[in-house]
Amino acid sequence: MNPTQQHLADRVSGLTEEVIVGTDYFLVDVEVRGHKGTRVVEVYIDSEEEVGHDDLALISKEIGFLLDVEDVVDGSYKLELSSPGIKRPLTMPAQYRKNVGRTLRVRFESDGDEEIVVGDLTDADDEEIELELPSAERLQLPYTTITQARIELPW
C-alpha cells in the first residue's frame, strides 16, 4: 500500500474497532486498493465462533455509515467486509485458537534459518502455538518466530 492507502487503512481500522467493540468480533486486517473514485476498502473481521452473514451485513452498514459521516474516503468507494477465509494467513492468537485441530503449514525462524513444518495445531494461547508433527513430536512455536501460517487444505 502507498502512504495514502495506509493512512486510509489506519482510519478504517479505527472506525471498525469502534463498531465491533463489545462484540465477539475482532479486526484482522484492512486493505485498500485503487485510486480516488475507484477505491476498494476490504475489511476482514473474525470471531472465535462462526461469523454470521447477518452480523456482517449490520457491521458493514455501520462501518459504511461512519466512513461517509466522517468523510474518510475521498470520492466513491466500494466497501467489502468479510471473514478472512481459509486461504488467508493466520495472524492473531484468536485465529489460531479458532483453528485448533486443523492442520497448518507454518513458516518460522529458528536460529537465523527459516523452516517450514506441517502439523496438527493442538494448542494456542496468547504467546505460542503447539503443533503435533507427523512424527508425533510436539513443537512449541512462539508467535514472534512465525513468519507465516496457513491452514493446510486436505485435498
Swiss-Prot record:
Disulfide pattern: none
Chief subcellular location: cytoplasm
InterPro entries in the record: Ribosome_maturation_RimP, RimP_C, RimP_C_sf, RimP_N, RimP_N_sf
GO biological process, one term: translation
Segments crossing the lipid bilayer: none
UniProt GO cellular component terms: cytosol
Subcellular location: Cytoplasm
Record carries keyword Translocase: no
The keyword Zinc appears for this protein: no
Matching Pfam families: DUF150_C, RimP_N
Key words, A-Z: Cytoplasm, Ribosome biogenesis
CDD domains named among the record's database cross-references: YlxS_C
Function: Required for maturation of 30S ribosomal subunits.
HAMAP family: RimP
Protein family: Belongs to the RimP family.
Name of the protein this chain belongs to: Ribosome maturation factor RimP
Protein's organism: Salinibacter ruber (strain DSM 13855 / M31)
Gene name tied to this protein: rimP
